[in-house]
Amino acid sequence: AAGSVPATNQLVDYVVNVGVGSPATTYSLLVDTGSSNTWLGADKSYVKTSTSSATSDKVSVTYGSGSFSGTEYTDTVTLGSLTIPKQSIGVASRDSGFDGVDGILGVGPVDLTVGTLSPHTSTSIPTVTDNLFSQGTIPTNLLAVSFEPTTSESSTNGELTFGATDSSKYTGSITYTPITSTSPASAYWGINQTIRYGSSTSILSSTAGIVDTGTTLTLIASDAFAKYKKATGAVADNNTGLLRLTTAQYANLQSLFFTIGGQTFELTANAQIWPRNLNTAIGGSASSVYLIVGDLGSDSGEGLDFINGLTFLERFYSVYDTTNKRLGLATTSFTTATSN
């Protein structure tokens, strides 16, 4: 049967408690739909038990920010009430860029793991979701994610549900869209979408990008970012690296409309800003307003033109459906929240 695990919003990422071994040691792993290897050892060391078994492989992954390398083991992994025997995990001997987490729970598409093992460079590594399904523990190969906005630096307000959706966590119905055929977004939880600002300003015409719980900001291609910056009147803030608005500009900030799978999802003005009472946590000023839309760093038309990150997903329920090769989104009771 399906099972749910609570997730903690740490402002820049979400983590879940993952048990490894028997008896289990608990690790705090970053929930990442943008990568597919599960690994630990960034903070708390790996504790070997009778269920721990080294394979003959080394494992290494390089991320958008950070990397790790180490040894592959198989071990019993527990996620809430769900148990996964013989799950592959990486045990880091070196890592960089992972403060505040023990490692990553990689729940992206399995093919992203090809090339991460050595010498078995052509072998893929089933994710926790894949194994839960193949071992018959959950009825369908699917992960559903509920994130919510936060006004504190750590809030256990999220939920991962393996094998089902949780209807108490969303409103209306779920809109599904097929995984895009455009490369390189197609290798990830990639979708096609358009973005407009307010009633009529096009920011991004129909294009491919990815939905990624492991990216904090909502990133758009550089040319689209320039249009957004101009439309909002924002200026680049050197202290935070974010766009900054005055309170007067914020009062005039329009919604961003994301059209996905024939449905339009509204990212409200409040959803576009960093939680104001946490401005100082990122080096900002308490009296300013900072935007969570950032510059992807490459122009549109390259096959990965946006990343709908954690800040987007705090406002919508998301479903990562491997069985049907599709991604689902739904509104929630937090879609129009004004807590930021």
Swiss-Prot record:
Keywords: Aspartyl protease, Glycoprotein, Hydrolase, Protease
Protein name in UniProt: Polyporopepsin
Start and end residues of each Peptidase A1 domain: 14-330
InterPro entries membership: Aspartic_peptidase_A1 (IPR001461), Aspartic_peptidase_AS (IPR001969), Pepsin-like_dom (IPR034164), PEPTIDASE_A1 (IPR033121), Peptidase_aspartic_dom_sf (IPR021109)
Enzyme Commission no: 3.4.23.29
Residues at the active site: 32, 212
Single GO MF annotation: aspartic-type endopeptidase activity
Lineage, top ranks: Eukaryota, Fungi, Dikarya, Basidiomycota, Agaricomycotina
Native organism: Irpex lacteus (Milk-white toothed polypore)
Catalysed reaction equations from the record: Milk clotting activity, broad specificity, but fails to cleave 15-Leu-|-Tyr-16 or 16-Tyr-|-Leu-17 of insulin B chain
Example of a GO biological process term: proteolysis
